[in-house]
Design a protein with these regions (language model features):
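Active-site region of glycoside hydrolase catalytic domains
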Residues: 1-173
Length: 174
């Protein structure tokens, strides 16, 4: 709601202003080819991108009700709120950090230690930095497609980050 009202205010000040949102981009692979793992990835993607979908599309996506019910959230939204949400961002930007895997059976795989999605697993095909971040440049190439399919505008990639140790005078980490 705050995003929609900020967009509305900015556009009322100057219709030429471009207002965007920024999301954390996470490529999530199924841990195995088990169809249940693929469904787990689809459900996690829905949760990860739910709010950027609202900001870019101006309404809650079809799956939001199910996600909220599963989390015990009761969304109270008025007609006035629904109208306000129509003030959508002009672009969605994203910051890609790493990829992960997911499995329907949460006991499988090595946990990543993610504080945002604790059920995520390490990708056994990715190298890992000394800080435990998975190194997966191909994940960046694969990421935008599922996340932005419903969006009316192309995404803007703002940065690629990697958690690693930096040493003064040693130059950029590789």
């Amino acid at each position: 709601m705050a995003s929609a009202k900020a967009v509305q205010l900015a556009h009322s000040i100057d219709p030429e202003y471009k207002v965007g949102s920024m999301i954390l981009a996470v490529t999530i692979y199924p841990l195995t080819p088990n169809p249940d793992d693929i469904i787990e990835v689809m459900e996690l993607d829905n949760e990860v991108y739910l709010f950027s979908d609202v900001q870019a599309l101006g309404a809650y996506p079809y799956y939001a009700k199910r996600v909220f019910e599963e989390k015990g959230v009761q969304l109270e939204i008025s007609d006035e709120d629904r109208e306000a949400l129509t003030h959508t961002v002009d672009f969605v930007s994203f910051s890609y950090y790493s990829s992960n895997c997911a499995a329907a059976d949460h006991s499988l795989g090595e946990p990543t230690g993610s504080n945002m999605v604790p059920t995520l697993k390490r990708n056994p095909y990715s190298k890992v930095s000394e800080w435990g971040w998975q190194i997966d440049p191909k994940g960046l190439a694969l990421h935008p497609e599922p996340a932005v399919q419903p969006l009316p505008q192309a995404p803007v990639h703002c940065r690629k980050r990697l958690g690693c140790q930096r040493h003064p005078g040693a130059g950029r980490p590789r």
